[in-house]
Regions:
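Acidic, metal/ion-coordinating pockets
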Residues: 1-290, 329-341, 351, 504-506
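Catalytic centers of hydrolytic enzymes
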Residues: 2-8, 12-27, 31-46, 159-174, ...
Length: 555
């Protein structure tokens, strides 16, 4: 064997069903996709052969109609995600939170069909405390033992109902990584230890089972880990952490198969023939300009045809165009439609909803199944929770506090946003937590600070609104389980108390509910419910116009 050699590790994450170079939602060709990743992988395999490993960081089962079709419309066939990973010969994968969200029947079937090992060391059986998935995988490459330790973000109970993860307990990433690094170093005699995390760099929810995004914290505090491949937060980023006399790379290739991370392990052998890692070079590789793998496309041509036929089916029509961008500046048809559907289905008193995408447009005219993935991105269910008037008010206070600034002069920004080095403006916080309410009439005072902005005037029916009264409130399951912390940090409801507040859960996912509503009415007027506004308008209206031009520059 050579005294020095290189090993390549290619890493994808958060693919979200972007398997093919066609966007079934927008009904047009797209960049990225696993079809292009496949070309890149094949080219490097010709050079490196068995010295190349291909791994994935999870969230592969949700996002595009191809996933939905395979998961729920025709689950009798092997899952398309498993078929894609098997075709590309993936070596290891860590499971993601959106994989868990598909439901036990889907993800258990997937784990049984995919040929690579599926990891999550910090997900244990509640009764036995033994790992629910494999904690790690060992790959021997050119005489080198490489250990991959899988970690899943532990804050799943904040987003998903317990029926989706019943019998599982989620442990702190840092402590669990420390345990398994010691194990693979001592028991498995691993030469290289890699963290394969479905967890982002830092930030997010700080739960009672650890931080949502813990890659940097782990790199700083766990001795014996060589580098970390992370994901979940969709942030394209590479960082190097100095800890314990070592430099540890942490890399995230973002989402939707536009990038992958490529790590080159420079290895040497000691006098006894034992492999030793001398250095690592890590880079982010954009694959948007890679050629599409023709053999990949031939293999999956029948699947593509089936999914296009499903996604192109017309289910109704819109009387006007819907744009998510309008939702950030006041009442808008997009949010009003979702509120209408939620109130119609649940007969609740009040509805909460936020736009799930920054800027999508569904034009007036025919509505197809594919449009529903723009209307509603994920397979959330629809919940009804019992809340007091004061809790609703406090929830809205936190929602708008993440969304708007306190204006002190007419020249101030109204939107809570920041400018990037390239001059573009973006939200400072996650827009899918910008909840508005229907069923109540209220004002948002932009001149007042958090805690005193929301003035609820009445129920939209004309009846009085009371802080002490209890109301039935409709919301998606992400919010209803504590996602975005609007129920916990905002409304002040302890996480452990939330299940007792849930009055009903829809058996269908929200996209199915929306489809049934549109098919029933056929023509959707998409009117705007002007039940709330920013005040004082002398401050708010000019600022809204200015900030809208910054966030969405005229073309």
């Amino acid at each position: 064997m050579k005294p020095s050699f290189d090993i390549k590790i290619l890493h994808t994450t958060d693919v979200h069903g972007c398997f093919f170079p066609f966007d079934f939602i927008e009904r047009k060709p797209c960049s990225g996709s696993m079809a292009r990743v496949s070309s890149y992988v094949k080219r490097l395999r010709k050079k490196y052969g068995r010295r190349l490993l291909l791994v994935d960081g999870g969230d592969v089962l949700q996002g595009q109609p191809a996933c939905y079709y395979s998961n729920y419309v025709d689950p009798s066939l092997p899952n398309v995600a498993a078929e894609v990973l098997n075709y590309m010969r993936y070596d290891v994968q860590t499971i993601g939170n959106h994989d868990i969200e598909t439901g036990r029947a889907v993800y258990d079937k997937y784990v049984g069909e995919v040929h690579c090992e599926v990891l999550a060391a910090n997900v244990v059986d509640t009764a036995t405390l033994r790992p629910r998935f494999k904690p790690y995988a060992i790959r021997e490459v050119h005489g080198t033992r490489i250990a991959f330790i899988g970690m899943l973000t532990p804050t799943i109970p904040y987003w998903l109902h317990e029926t989706l993860w019943q019998g599982m307990t989620f442990l702190d990433i840092v402590a669990t990584t420390r345990k398994w690094v010691a194990h693979v170093r001592q028991t498995e005699q691993a030469d290289v230890v890699v963290g394969l995390f479905h967890s982002g760099f830092e930030g997010g929810i700080a739960g009672n089972t650890g931080n949502e995004n813990a890659a940097l914290e782990t790199a700083r505090s766990v001795v014996g880990i060589d580098f970390i491949l992370c994901g979940h937060d969709h942030r394209l980023r590479k960082a190097t952490v100095s800890a314990g006399g070592k430099h540890i790379d942490v890399v995230n290739p973002s989402s939707n198969a536009h990038y992958l991370s490529e790590s080159t392990l420079h290895m040497a052998r000691d006098a006894h023939g034992r492999s030793r890692l001398t250095s690592i070079d890590t880079q982010l590789v954009c694959i948007d300009n890679e050629p599409v793998d023709a053999d990949f496309m031939r293999r999956f041509a029948p699947t593509i045809t089936q999914v296009r036929r499903y996604a192109d089916r017309e289910i109704g029509s819109l009387a006007r165009t819907l744009r998510t961008r309008d939702c950030f500046f006041g009442p808008a048809p997009f949010n009003s439609l979702i509120h209408d559907i939620q109130l119609d289905y649940t007969k609740a008193d009040i509805s909460l909803n936020a736009p799930l995408k920054f800027d999508v447009c569904i034009p007036k005219g025919p509505v197809r199944v594919s449009d529903l993935f723009n209307l509603y991105t994920y397979e959330n269910q629809l919940y009804v929770l019992r809340m007091t008037g004061q809790e609703i008010r406090s929830l809205l206070e936190l929602s708008y506090d993440q969304w708007i600034a306190t204006m002190r002069s007419p020249r101030d920004h109204i939107m809570l946003m920041q400018q990037t080095p390239d001059g573009q403006w973006h939200w400072r916080n996650l827009a899918f937590n910008f909840d508005t309410a229907a069923g109540i009439d209220y004002e948002v005072n932009v001149a007042r600070p958090h805690g005193s902005r929301i003035n609820i005037l009445r129920l939209s029916s004309g009846r009085p609104f009371s802080d002490e009264a209890h109301y039935r409130v409709a919301m998606n399951s992400y919010r209803g389980n504590g996602g975005g912390e609007l129920l916990t940090r905002g409304a002040g409801i302890p996480l452990a108390e939330i299940p007792s507040r849930i009055e009903s859960i829809s058996p269908e996912d929200q996209r199915t509910i929306i489809m049934a509503y549109i098919e029933r009415l056929h023509t959707i007027p998409a009117t705007t419910h002007h039940n709330w506004r920013f005040v004082p308008e002398s401050l708010a209206l000019p600022a809204l116009a200015r900030d809208r031009r910054l966030l969405f520059p005229p073309s």
